[in-house]
Structure formats: C-alpha cells, structure tokens
C-alpha cells in the first residue's frame, strides 16, 4: 500500500510543481486505547497508530518560499514566506504544516523553504489526530531533507509547540508522539512527563478479538473553548494541591486530595478523573503483559464513565455508541480523543463484530442521526519515509 500511495502523491506533486519530489513520507493518525486527558497533566497514555495516514511529497527550496497544497482542497498551492511565519499569522489548514517550519526555525534549524503536496486518509474531526499526522509528516520530511538529526520524540515536541503556540490549540504531547513513535502490532505506553516509552504487544486478532472505531461524525475542534477550560481546571487543581501536575497525586491518596479541595466541585471532578485514569492506564498495561487481554474491556467502561460523569466531555452520540455496543455483547467500549464528538472504541469478540456494528448503526438510524463510520483499528506503523 505504501508504494501505491507514494506513487499517487508523487505524481500529483509533479503535476503541481513540474519536478520530481525529493521524497515521500507518511505519518499515521492514532487511536488512544486508554489514558484520556492525562497527557497535559504529565500522566500516562496508551495510543497506537492507525493505518490511516497523512502522506507528503516534498522537495527543498533555497529561496525562502514555502508552497503547500492539499489533495482535499481544489485550489492552487498556498505560497508563504518562511521568514514571515509567526504565531497567529495563518488561520487556515496551512497553519499545521507551516507551524512546523516555524517551530523548527525557532529551535535554531535553518530551513530555506519547501514545495509540499499533502494527502490524508485520517478522518478530520473524529478525534483520531488528523492534525498531528499533518504536523509529524512534514516534520519528518524536514528532518530528513535538511539532515537535522532529530529523533521521533524530539520531532513530537516541536510539533506540539507548533500546535500550542502557532495554531493556538492547547493540546498535550500524546498525539504527535504516537504518530512519530508507534510501531506496528503494538500499543505505546508513554509517560508524557519525560517521554519514556514502552512498546506493548497488542495483537487482538491472535486472541480472537477486534477493536472497532466508531466515528460518530459529530465534529469538534480542540481550539474551541471547552478543551482549554478542562486544561485550566486541571492546572488549578494541581496548584491547589501544591503539586507540579496532577500526575503527582498518588492514586492511594486521592480521597485525601479531594478532601483538601473542599467545595471546588468542578476541580474535584477533574482531579478525580485524571488520577483514576492514570491508574487505569497502568492497569491495562499490567493486564496486557499478563495475557489477560479480555479484562481490559471493563477498564474501558470505567474510563468512559469517568469521562462522561467527572470530566464531562462525552455527548449523546458517544454515549449511544457505548451503551448500544455493551448491550449487544461488546467486551468494553469508551469514547476516545478530545471529546464533544469524535469517536468511540469498542472491544469485541471477532464473532460479534457484525452484530455490534449493526446494532450501533441501527441505533443511530432510530435516533435520526447520520450513519456512523465503523472500521477495525489495527495497530500500525509510525511515521516513516516511503520513497
């Protein structure tokens, strides 16, 4: 598949720019198995890469010009001056790739421009890190073409800075690290404080199970308000408890910490979610490493309840997916991603895939909702050069 995609993207690059690209790169979207809204609290996460990916054909320029083109937009390439790139200067889709060049230059790397053609199969607005895939694929291309010598986690940090400062979205580090560092057949157990990581084998098919992603097709944007409010509330909780981040509140001390927060009810809810979610990540790692994979289903259900009731970022469509899937025999289910729409994941026996899928589709139809998009999530390769 990689060669075919590279050929198509390379051919379009030639049509646009009249020359061969110097290379073609790919970076995947991700789904988060467990560990939601913990990354900006220095906590634990456990994503894996999807087969859906952003692909970029790229060549260097030496005249300070950056030209960007997307296969999704019927328009000529957007032309920008590298020296003029600045936070807030770009409000369109091009902010994600141009922000990467800005972040690399801010970090002291001399980049003299590029011609870029981008194509992506990562669903936008589905909570599957379409923006991170765009950032990481261009960062990897720049790293290779300009021989910057940066490692995956370093590229992820720069991409996060691009999205935080240049785009203005207060995202954590998980999405970019997952896209840059995941390995096929594994979930990534990531400590977001120091970016230490462990690849955990995750082969559901070998155990007779599947993980479905259900895209509700309800769109959301991290840049709009609610995500930032949750992050600010978590930071307030850490300050009130006298810790650097909520990751520093031990699970065993949670009740005492909640008592100390007194009548700060909203902050109490946010703190409870983050501390218990970190514990859930560690529990899932232990279950997978001990071979008790089916037992992670119950942990997913716990996580959804916490996101719905404490963090309050679910929505009726996500709850409908989870409730319907569980009623139809799924082993576990929860919302995934930033919330307020997007996707849910469903752990199901292989023999039950069709029944659960039909039940969810029928439930959406009965509720008068747009048909959800359902697909199997297979742990796939992280960012890499195709050609």
Swiss-Prot record:
Keyword Transmembrane: no
Record site feature (Transition state stabilizer), residues: 30
GO biological process entries: galactose metabolic process
Keywords: ATP-binding, Carbohydrate metabolism, Cytoplasm, Galactose metabolism, Kinase, Magnesium, Metal-binding, Nucleotide-binding, Transferase
Active-site residues (renumbered): 175
InterPro entries named among the record's database cross-references: Galactokinase, Galactokinase_bac, Galactokinase_CS, GalKase_N, GHMP_kinase_C_dom, GHMP_kinase_C_sf, GHMP_kinase_N_dom, GHMP_knse_ATP-bd_CS
Subcellular location, record wording: Cytoplasm
The protein's Enzyme Commission number: 2.7.1.6
Family: Belongs to the GHMP kinase family. GalK subfamily.
Name the record gives this protein: Galactokinase
Gene name linked to the record: galK
